[in-house]
Amino acid sequence: MRRLRRLVHLVLLCPFSKGLQGRLPGLRVKYVLLVWLGIFVGSWMVYVHYSSYSELCRGHVCQVVICDQYRKGIISGSVCQDLCELQKVEWRTCLSSAPGQQVYSGLWQDKEVTIKCGIEEALNSKAWPDAAPRRELVLFDKPTRGTSIKEFREMTLSFLKANLGDLPSLPALVDQILLMADFNKDSRVSLAEAKSVWALLQRNEFLLLLSLQEKEHASRLLGYCGDLYLTEGIPHGSWHGAVLLPALRPLLPSVLHRALQQWFGPAWPWRAKIAIGLLEFVEELFHGSYGTFYMCETTLANVGYTATYDFKMADLQQVAPEATVRRFLQGRHCEQSSDCIYGRDCRAPCDRLMRQCKGDLIQPNLAKVCELLRDYLLPGAPAGLYEELGKQLRTCTTLSGLASQIEAHHSLVLSHLKTLLWREISNTNYS
């Protein structure tokens, strides 16, 4: 014990020779303070890591809840047997950024997948933080027993009209949903199958995946069980999901986000190819088969890409249908335009006379994406391209006015940007 005390004394209190201590008495105190500060910060980081992990990463809770409902016959789905009976769905890295939306990387049928599951009800009570929760069956309460397939079809169509708008393409989407619900191909939709699909439709991202399933830049849906679903593996580029602790992500300044993206991101020509894919995704969101969609959180966190540097939207949670945004904003009480915001950056004007928000957005998707691309593309851009690219991006970011009234200008600016980038990387290995 005496030897241990002497060792601690030597490390903490005697870092310098006695002669040096005599000449610089203040250094010893500073050294001790620095060491203890390091110990404190390290302890805090360990505490944050484990507390945030236990709060944000509750895949085991999600699996217990889903499999409990499956064994009771309340829900079903194409991955239920593999998830709950055969244990063939492997949960790997936790990527969750909010307790209510569990996101994990995983492996299923020898494919890299992303596992997503909502457990809002399960997290409401703190009485059993580590035990399997008794989830109330609020999510799986519709449709009720006795509902006919015709009634379920009408119910689904009404839901889609409310969220996507009254579009002529919706009946075809309803047919696809019913086909997906009949995962065992027995030509009938059971109550458990209907409950599962209805619960999935309440998930914003799942509805977006269905609406954008034919688009190149959205992840493909692979299977589901209840309201848990699997998509293609998380694309490259979502580096902060693995590098940063989930609790620290919101604390990181946007400037540091951008710097890290440039340091750890791909070479400039690959970034140009990814940017072209992002611009194509903006086109896909504008007047598609199922209406217009708005990007309501435009950040580098969502700029994902495949192994061949083709753009993939990393997260569709903050992409919203026009009808949903309008319903939320129109008629909402406001004193100024800052009161009329959906998500993070979908803003509408405030009618100060009526003190109500209007339904049309001020800034289109393209203007927000171009703001993002200024930080993503200009650093490291070729000298001969830098000035023209900067000019095009500045023009793009100034797009304003009602999003529904700028279609022609929107398309022209977008086309010019894509052409400029393609010209730079065409006839090279990067194309």
Swiss-Prot record:
Disulfide bonds join C57-C94, C62-C117. Signal peptide: none annotated. Keywords: Disulfide bond, Endoplasmic reticulum, Membrane, Signal-anchor, Transmembrane, Transmembrane helix. Expressed in kidney, testis, lung, heart, stomach, intestine, pancreas, liver and salivary gland. Strongly expressed in acute pancreatitis, brain, and in peripheral endothelial cells. It comes from the Eukaryota. One of its GO terms (cellular component) is endoplasmic reticulum membrane. It is found in: Endoplasmic reticulum membrane. PANTHER family: DIVERGENT PROTEIN KINASE DOMAIN 1B, DIVERGENT PROTEIN KINASE DOMAIN 1C-RELATED. Belongs to the DIPK family. This is Divergent protein kinase domain 1B. It comes from Mus musculus. The lineage of its organism: Eukaryota, Metazoa, Chordata, Craniata, Vertebrata. The gene is Dipk1b.
